[in-house]
């Protein structure tokens, strides 16, 4: 009866995870690229930058406006001027009394005006700067995608480890249940004490607690993967590939400056360089053309008299309180700062690559040691189990051996997991992912 109770307890621990969903690594990465909210935000940034570039077309395209304005006045100057514009002036209108005290009159003006930029050197350079900004934002999106792919690979690797560890712990629980059954039988026969039974039960509880912890971590990792993939689900994911030691693509991989994050910084620096040139171009004159066509009439819908005017404007801001020169100086400082920040970022990432390579070597050594320790612990447990069955070993010794064997199995799996995580990091830093 007790054996059945412990078996039921073991099953009840794993019962919540029956609703599981197999998950392939590439499927997870594909869903991330389609649905991840961060990537959607990055895409909006690209669209906004493209829109900024479109706005600069105003520096090349004409501005066209139409207006219709009505007046009613007895002001001497305007009254006579409106008559001139309507082309209705007569000899009698030059009478001083009429000039000084005109009758009130109405006037309607329909105007078509056009303004055409001709030479605005700063706008040319501003468009080049915005193109570099668009490239930088696109690289930032690519970097975000690469980073999210790395996060998925790391989470997937940890999930593989947890399931392998769970299998090891599950076997350990079954082994403890069997030891408990044998110890209870030996107690019935007078070969074991009640304290031995309690000792086994305590050991079983400890292993079951480990399984609960593993199941909780699996659920948390599944939630994290769902978020990365942009999936609103509470499914528990199961890796379709088991945990194995992954090969490194190139043991002599060098740091790559062609990574998306560094390319984004390079484009950002180039954009600032173009902005510096743009501010310098504002010191040059600007040439713009303009023209307008007018209809003048006393009736609201009249198109009586008409006239046109065209011209060009050359403007040059010779001095604006030293504002332009201060802006140029500020932009130079910002450019130097951006260049130094990029250099610092590259130096830190090179250090990170060296660290990751050393971690890889250390993890390989850990795998070798963990493999030996696991084999030794397994052989030790086999010997002690045989002696325990013959009554030649204490229950405490058997429990210690079982705990050690389980620990070494998990340590071996953990070493493989850490090795694979180091590979993921190296491949990212060397742009091999």
Residue ranges, per PLM feature:
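Transmembrane beta-barrel architecture of outer-membrane proteins
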Residues: 107-111, 154, 199, 286, ...
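Acidic, low-complexity, intrinsically disordered peripheral segments
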Residues: 65, 74-77, 411-433
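Periplasmic alpha-helical coiled-coil/stalk elements that build and connect Gram-negative outer-membrane
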Residues: 51, 141, 145-256, 356-359, ...
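Small/polar (Gly/Ser/Thr/Ala-rich) solvent-exposed segments
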Residues: 40, 63-77, 101-105, 115-143, ...
């Amino acid at each position: 009866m007790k054996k059945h109770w412990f078996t039921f307890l073991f099953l009840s621990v794993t019962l919540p995870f029956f609703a599981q969903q197999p998950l392939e690594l590439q499927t997870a990465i594909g869903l991330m690229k389609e649905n991840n909210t961060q990537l959607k935000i990055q895409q909006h940034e690209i669209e906004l930058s493209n829109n900024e570039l479109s706005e600069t077309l105003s520096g090349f395209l004409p501005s066209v406006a139409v207006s219709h304005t009505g007046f009613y006045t007895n002001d001497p100057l305007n009254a006579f001027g409106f008559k001139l514009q309507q082309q209705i002036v007569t000899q009698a209108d030059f009478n001083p009394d009429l000039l000084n005290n005109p009758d009130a009159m109405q006037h309607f003006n329909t105007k078509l005006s056009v303004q055409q930029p001709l030479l605005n050197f700063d706008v040319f350079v501003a468009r080049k700067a915005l193109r570099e900004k668009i490239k930088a934002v696109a690289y930032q999106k690519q970097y975000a995608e690469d980073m999210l792919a790395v996060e998925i690979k790391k989470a997937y690797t940890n999930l593989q480890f947890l399931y392998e560890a769970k299998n090891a712990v599950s076997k350990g629980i079954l082994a403890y249940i069997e030891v408990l059954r044998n110890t209870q039988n030996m107690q019935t026969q007078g070969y074991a004490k009640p304290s031995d039974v309690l000792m086994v039960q305590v050991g079983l509880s400890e292993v079951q607690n480990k399984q609960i912890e593993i199941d909780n971590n699996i659920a948390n990792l599944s939630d994290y993967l769902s978020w990365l993939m942009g999936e609103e689900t509470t499914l528990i994911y199961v890796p379709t590939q088991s945990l194995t030691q992954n090969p490194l693509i190139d043991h002599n991989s060098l740091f790559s400056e062609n990574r998306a994050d560094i390319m984004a910084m390079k484009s950002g620096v180039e954009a600032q360089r173009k902005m510096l040139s743009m501010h310098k171009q504002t010191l040059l004159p600007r040439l713009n053309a303009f023209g307008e066509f007018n209809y003048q009439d006393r009736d609201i819908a009249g198109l009586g008299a008409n006239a046109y005017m065209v011209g060009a404007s050359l403007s040059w801001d010779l001095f604006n309180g030293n504002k332009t020169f201060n802006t140029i100086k500020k932009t130079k400082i910002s450019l130097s700062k951006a260049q130094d920040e990029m250099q610092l970022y590259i130096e830190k990432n090179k250090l990170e690559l060296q660290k990751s390579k050393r971690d890889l070597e250390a993890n390989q050594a850990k795998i070798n040691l963990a493999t030996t320790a696991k084999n030794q612990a397994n052989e030790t447990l086999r010997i002690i189990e045989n002696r325990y069955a013959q009554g030649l070993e204490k229950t405490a010794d058997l429990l210690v051996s079982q705990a050690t064997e389980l620990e070494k199995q998990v340590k071996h799996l953990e070493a493989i997991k850490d090795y694979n995580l180091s590979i993921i990091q190296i491949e990212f830093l060397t742009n091999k992912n």
